[in-house]
Amino acid sequence: GRLDATNAVGVPDVTVITKIGYDHMAVLGNTLAEIAAEKTGIIKKGTSLVLESQEAEVMTVFEAKVREEGITDFRLIDPLEIKEQTYRDGRQYFSFGAYRDLSMRMLGVHQYENAIAALLGAEAFFRRHTEWICGGTKEREEGVRRAVCQGIAKTVWKGRMEILSKKPFLLVDGAHNSNGVEALRE
């Protein structure tokens, strides 16, 4: 956000913003709109923006910032676009747009949007740097996309919805705010 150390870097190629919740309220504000206003400080003219679905009051703040900065490469993740959500063998599977049968080891319905945010953020980066990364060929571009999907499939976040034992069932999660507790409940 506005106070984030990453602002010292300048204009990022891509900005990805996940679900806004009540966290760090002493610094960011007491309402979702106040917190969102602080978070929009990371959005700069010329960046690509990927935004997870948000509460209506948060979306109002983000939409105003997008207009103010003239952001043209903006993707809002619609949870209704996430298809074929299943769980088997300790993994979650899903499809999104052209991506079929994606898998991940991270558990929880919130992780679908997080994984898609990573995919769309990578796509936005690739759009800016295709020649540099892919050498301009479709085959290389597809190879890079496969690599991103493989990275998501292999990602583990210790202490987040982590099943330590099935018998007896023992799940560990470091939820520390209302969004985290809600995700754990779901």
Segments and roles (model prediction):
Residues P12, V16-L102, A115, L119-C134, ...:
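Acidic, Mg2+-coordinating active-site environments of NTP-dependent enzymes
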Residues R2-T6, A26-G29:
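Glycine/threonine-rich flexible loop motifs
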Residues L3-V16, I20-G21, E34, A98-E186:
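Nucleotide phosphate-binding/pyrophosphate-handling subdomain across enzymes
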